[in-house]
Amino acid sequence: MELNYAFNKARSTLQALTPADRHRLASICRDIQQSEDSLNTAAAKDMHKCMAACTGICCRNIRLTEIIGFYDFVYILTVAGGMKKNIRACLKHESLFSSDCIFLKNGKGPCIFPPNARPRICITSFCFEDTPVKQQIRDVNRRFKKLSRFVLARQMKKMAASLFH
């Protein structure tokens, strides 16, 4: 299914990177984590309210492929490579239709991903007015775009090399 494909593609993409590219990708991912930390700090008061009154609405009845994809898996596997086995187990429950998030522990929560290794949408979506943290959200999104451009450039380089050799 879609997520399984994205996960396997992320794994093979990471395996194909040179040591220098892995180092650069790790640096980009650390920048994402720093942006996430800034966002969490700026949103701490509202996040505390959100978590205290959490009903899990943001993880229920969702189309998971709209929340997590290839670049999210590249990010997660880079910063939390030990999650492979857990992710693979969750992917066995992927549905074609809207369902609760398959990455919730025991199907209820909390999320299996560590706080500093979550998909972009999960990092930047809130159940409260996010105007006070718009700049921090933009920063996280900008850094995820940098990650996607980096990966795309490596894929294009690999494709060009295979065409001309």
Residue ranges: model-predicted function:
Residues 1-165:
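Hydrophobic scaffolds flanking metal-cofactor catalytic centers in soluble metalloenzymes
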